[in-house]
From Swiss-Prot:
InterPro entries: Pentatricopeptide_rpt, PPR_At4g14850-like_plant, TPR-like_helical_dom_sf. The gene is PCMP-E33. Pfam families: PPR (PF01535), PPR_2 (PF13041). It comes from Arabidopsis thaliana (Mouse-ear cress). Residues 775-836 are annotated as: Type E motif. One of its GO terms (molecular function) is RNA binding. It comes from the Eukaryota. The keyword Repeat applies. Disulfide bonds: none annotated. GO terms for biological process: RNA modification. PPR repeats lie at residues 1-35, 36-62, 63-98, 99-133, 134-164, 165-199, 200-230, 233-263, 264-298, 299-333, 334-364, 365-399, 400-434, 435-465, 466-500, 501-535, 536-566, 568-602, 603-637, 638-668, 669-703, 704-734, 740-770. The keyword Repeat applies. This is Pentatricopeptide repeat-containing protein At2g39620.
Length: 836
């Protein structure tokens, strides 16, 4: 191509990269040609405003065209303040009259910088010059006013325009849709078609969010038809899927997804998000498998949806696979993906991995902090959640409603009402309390801390009292065991004209379960059927749980077998737990086997239940088989699973295996240490128990009453009197833990077996709690062992007073004749069996 002015300008327009632009610029300099305007525009396309400015400054008296090029370049690069500065300098300092293009670019800069005061001044200048009706200026004014949420002014400008092109109509429709005026946007679109404006892809694209918010399937189908007619189906597939999802028409969304023969990453991500939004998590994971098989690039929407699904079903193996694929796709650096990963691992019980992911996030935003606080809260680590919230506040990251909701739940968990009150005050100052979610969390926090006066005040301040607020207040009363007041709240809910939702029914069932109130539970069941909630899974789960807690296992079995709801892993877990509560471990094992036959995927809770069943049956072979499955699934390091394995092996006589499982637990909380202490105590390994007890304190873990009971029990079995006395004194003096009747029974038995009856009786005399059968029984056994007849008779007399209908007390004193005089005594038949 010969080098001339025309060819060089053509080459300048066709530059695809910055290096090519520099070469063409060099050729222009060599040729002595200076197309300043074209060069400024070219450098602006590569966002090199510094070089554009050098060229501009080299011109002695730049005209309005060059000024416009600079203003447009700054606006295009997002440097809106600089663009407005140039506009002001041109018109005010240099005295150059702006033309319609100057005004258009300046108004776009006002919209981009949200400087609407400047925009109003420019509008006044436009009106003075009589340029309001110009199609370019008018469109820019409409866009600016829509960004300012001043739809009245935008519509006035729009209506004054004599000539409107498709861009003008699209801008007005988009402005209405983005500001929540969906119906107005749809009406304007109809006007647009009535005016015979040739709609383009932008017209339809702007309308999709408006139609989505209307949630009308017939309107969705009309828009879908227009998209097909215009031939935009491929480009609009993601938007259509999202639109149908918002209208709860998942079947139509699936049809769009399947009809698109060339699916891009956006289509896959939107479809997965649609499934996740509607609770179809198994389908999300199936799509993920297909996406991976087809080697489709995964975007962050798909990654977040897949991780959410894995977390919900508790499938850690699948979650790890999604993590690996996200790493391959280079998504791991994205904050939203890292936050989703963090949530998935925490919900699957791998809190340590979640913590590490949180630490590795470089630019932690409020969402990341909130997710980690929520993770601690879900794991029951209320103190850690509160501590992290304090760290967040220390580095001046402003919490949102989600953050405050989680940390208020943490305050409720540790009964930290003073801190909860401080957070409540912060929510009021930050104007977050008015958000219903936060207000409900405040009510729940006060109620669960037993502070019903501020809870009721917060409740009364609510402008709109919905079912969620009533539920939160009622659950507070349930937690303190006041079923009557909880049901009074539910009655007031009806008086206020608030319709109960499914969560209300679940709350009422939880109250009945907590108080073992079968009669009320049956009435609630009737209300559930009346309102049509019986087919909802979480309601059915609460029903089964209520029946098992109210000694109505037969009713729970009937409900589970009838299956008026869709069974899930959760429902099988509840049924297994019900059998265990009623001492039917064999049925729990049978339920687990049936669950596997029906192809349900067990989660961590399932494994905890089956390991508990194996422990109760001392069925070592079953326990070892489950342990093998746990290793394959990667659940062994999870705290609840690890605790159950420690207990199972201890009850099956394999204390070495218990120790190994204890070591493998990644996060050892107080329950883990107590389980291992109990195992040592049951096996009479007092020295191991004491050593572990000391190690526990060295790890800065404060022992609780259960810890002391376990180590005292171990000392009792081994006859370690001095060690037991030291630990008992340490419990009250150092750790400020009030001794309970079980602790006294241990000490009386320990002292009595050592023949220290004086100390044993003195301890009983100094007891701050009422003596029980356990304490007198311990004294009776030890006194009989040492042939102390006077003391054994005294202990026996007290036992008979406490439990006159217990035949064992009479038989111990060889008063077998008196047993026949005791009426209505039933003895559970004994049995013996072997594991087959």
């Amino acid at each position: 191509m010969p080098i001339n002015y025309t060819n060089l300008l053509l080459m300048l327009r066709e530059c695809k990269n910055f290096r090519c632009l520099l070469q063409v610029h060099g050729s222009l300099i060599v040729s002595g040609l200076k197309p300043h305007n074209q060069l400024i525009n070219a450098y602006s396309l590569f966002q090199r405003q510094d070089l554009s400015r050098v060229i501009f400054d080299s011109v002695r008296d730049p005209g309005v065209v060059l000024w416009n090029s600079m203003i447009r370049g700054y606006t295009r690069a997002g440097l809106h303040r600089e663009a407005l500065g140039f506009f002001g300098y041109m018109s005010e300092e240099k005295g150059i009259d702006p033309d319609k293009y100057s005004f258009t670019f300046a108004l776009k800069a006002c919209a981009g910088s949200m400087d609407f005061k400047k925009g109003l001044r420019i509008h006044d200048l436009i009106a003075e010059m009589g340029l309001e009706s110009d199609v370019y200026i008018g469109t820019a004014l409409v866009e600016m006013y829509c960004k300012a949420r001043d739809l009245v002014s935008a519509r006035q400008v729009f209506d004054k325009m004599h000539v409107k092109d498709v861009v003008t109509w699209n801008t007005m429709v988009s402005g209405l849709a983005q500001n929540g005026c969906s119906s107005a946007a749809l009406l304007l679109f109809h006007d647009m078609r009535s005016c015979c404006v040739d709609i383009d892809h932008v017209s339809l694209y702007n309308l999709i969010p408006a139609v989505s918010k209307l949630e009308k399937s017939d309107v969705c189908r009309c828009l879908h038809g227009l998209v097909i007619k215009k031939g935009f189906i491929f480009a609009f597939s993601s938007g259509l899927i999202d639109m149908y999802c918002n209208c709860a028409d998942l079947y139509a969304a699936e049809s769009v997804f399947e009809e698109v023969w060339r699916k891009d990453e956006s289509s896959w991500g939107t479809m997965m998000a649609a499934y996740a939004h509607n609770g179809f998590f198994e389908e999300v994971l199936e799509l993920f498998d297909l996406m991976r098989n087809y080697d489709v690039r995964m975007n962050k929407v798909a990654a977040a949806s897949a991780l959410q699904a894995a977390a919900y079903v508790g499938d850690l193996v699948k979650g790890i696979a999604i993590h690996d694929y996200a790493v391959q796709q280079g998504l791991i650096g994205d904050v939203s993906v890292a936050t989703s990963l963090m949530s998935m691992y925490s919900k699957c019980g791998e809190l340590e991995i979640a913590e590490q992911l949180f630490i590795n996030i470089e630019d932690r935003d409020v969402v990341s902090w909130s997710a980690m606080i929520a993770s601690y809260e879900q794991a029951g680590q209320h103190d850690e959640a509160i501590s992290l919230f304090r760290d967040m506040m220390r580095i001046h990251i402003k919490p949102n409603a989600v953050t405050l909701t989680s940390v208020l739940q943490g305050c409720a968990g540790v009964a930290a009402s003073r801190l909860g009150k401080s957070i409540h005050c912060y929510a009021i100052k930050a104007d977050i309390e008015s958000e219903l979610e936060t207000a409900t969390a405040v009510i729940s926090m006060y109620a669960k801390c037993g502070r019903f006066s501020p809870a009721l005040k917060a409740f009364e301040r609510l402008p709109i009292k919905d079912a969620v607020a009533f539920n939160a207040l009622a659950q507070g009363y349930t937690q303190i065991g006041d079923a009557n007041k909880a049901f009074d709240v539910y009655k007031n809910m009806k008086l206020h004209g608030v319709c109960p939702d499914s969560r209300t029914m679940v709350g009422m069932l939880q109250t009945c379960a907590f108080c073992s109130d079968y009669a009320r539970g049956s009435c609630v069941y009737g209300q559930i059927i009346k309102h049509g909630f019986d087919s909802e899974c979480h309601v059915a789960h609460a029903l089964i749980n209520m029946f098992t807690k109210c000694d109505a296992l037969a009713a729970a079995i009937v409900l589970f077998d009838k299956c008026g709801f869709e069974k899930s892993t959760v429902s099988w877990n509840i049924m297994m737990n019900g059998y265990l509560l009623h001492g039917q471990a064999e049925e729990a094992v049978a339920t687990f086997r049936q669950m596997k036959v029906e192809k349900f995927q067990p989660n961590a809770v399932t494994f905890v239940n089956i390991v508990r069943a194996a422990a109760e049956l001392s069925a070592l072979r079953v326990g070892m088989s489950v342990h093998s499955s746990l290793i394959q699934c990667g659940f062994c390091s999870q705290t609840p699973v690890g605790n159950s394995l420690v207990d199972m092996y201890a009850k099956c006589g394999m204390i070495e295996s218990s120790e190994k499982c204890f070591i493998e637990i990644s996060n050892k909380y107080i329950v883990s240490w107590n389980t291992m202490l109990s195992a040592y105590a049951a096996h009479g390994l007092a020295s191991c128990a004491v050593s572990l007890f000391l190690s526990m304190q060295e790890n800065e873990l404060k022992p609780d009453s259960v810890s002391f009971l376990s180590v005292l029990s171990a000392c009792r079995h081994a006859g370690l009197v001095e060690e037991g006395k030291r630990i008992f004194e340490e419990m009250g003096e150092r750790h400020k833990i009030e001794a309970e009747v079980e602790h006294y029974a241990c000490m009386v038995d320990l002292l009595g077996k050592a023949g220290l009856f004086g100390e044993a009786v003195e301890m009983m005399r100094r007891m701050r709690v009422k003596t029980s059968v356990g304490v007198w029984g311990a004294l009776l056994n030890s006194s009989r062992m040492h042939c102390n007849l006077w003391l054994s008779n005294a202990a026996l007399c007290q036992l008979v007073k406490l439990e006159p209908l217990n035949p064992s007390h009479y038989s111990q004193d060889r008063r077998l004749g008196e047993v026949n005089n005791v009426s209505r005594i039933k003895k559970v038949p004994a049995c013996s069996w072997i594991e087959v």
